[in-house]
Amino acid sequence: MKKKIVAMICAAVMTAGLVACGSGEDTAATGSGAAALEDGETSTSDNTELSGSISMAGSTSMEKLANAVAESFMEKYPDVTVTAEFTGSSAGIESVIAGSVDIGNSSRALKEEEKAAGVAENIVAIDGIAMVLDPANTVTDLTKDQLISIYKGETRNWSELGGSDTPIVVVGREAGSGTRGAFEELLEIKDQCVYASELDSTGAVIAKVASTPGAIGYASLDAIGDTVIAASLEGVEATSENIKAGNYFLSRPFVMGTMGEISEQSDAVKALFEYLASDEGKEVIKKVGLITVD
C-alpha cells in the first residue's frame, strides 16, 4: 500500500458524508484516490449527530498528541468517546491488525510486512528526534558519524569529542520502541547499539539523562524540557523549522495506522481524520510541538 498523508484524504471520504449516525467498530485507512480537504472544512453538519467510540493504542512518543487530539475532538463531538493506550509502536500496529483497536499509533514508518497485512500508513504529523545530554555537558554539537560511534560503543569518553574527561553513558529505549527503531534506522545501526540503559518511556529517558553525568539519550522533540540539553546535529538545531525544511537529519513520521480505507470506516473514525486535516486539528498538532504535514 502506498504511503498516505492524512491531509490528502481520499475523495470518497468527503462524498461518503460524515453526517452521521452511530459509529461502527470498523477500522480506518487512507484511500487510493487522493483529494485534499479544504482547510477547516467539515462534512458533519451537526456535531451532536455524531456518536460512537474510537480506540487507539501504540507509541508512547505520541502520548501528548493522542491525548490532545482526543480531548479536543471529544469537546467538538461530545457523544464520541476516544480512548488511547500507550503500549509502544509495534504493539499498537499489532493491535490494529488484530482488530482490537481502531487506530494503531506508530512513531516510525510502517514495515513492509505491516503494510502487507493491510495496515495503511496515515501520517498525521512529523516529529524530530532530539539528542539529549545532561545539563553539565560542554559538548553541544554532534555529527552523524560521532553519534554512530557513540551508540556502537566505539567512542566512550566525552574527552574524545572535545569535552570533559567523563565516561559516556548511552541511554536508549527498549526493543520495540518506535523511537528506538526510527533512531537506529536513521543512523543505520539497527542491532548494533551498546546501551547502558534501555528504558520503557520517553519520560524515563529524559529523567535518566538529566540525572546522570555524561549521559546521552534520544527523545521526541516535543518532550524536551529545561532539565536536559538538546544537542545540535552537524550545526543544525533541533527545531520545527529546521525539521520541516529538511535540514535536520533525525526526524520521523507520526503514523495513525488503520485497516482498510478511511471511506470504509465508522463515521466517528472518519470524522477524526477529517478533523486532523482541518485548521482546528492542525492547531492541536502544533500546540504539542509537532509539525503538520501540509
Report the location of each language-model feature.
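Positively charged n-region of N-terminal signal peptides that target proteins for export
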Residues: 1-5, 9
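Hydrophobic helical h-region of N-terminal Sec-dependent signal peptides
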Residues: 10-15
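C-terminal motif of bacterial Sec signal peptides marking the signal peptidase cleavage site
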Residues: 16-20
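Exported/periplasmic ABC-transporter solute-binding proteins
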Residues: 22-98, 102-294
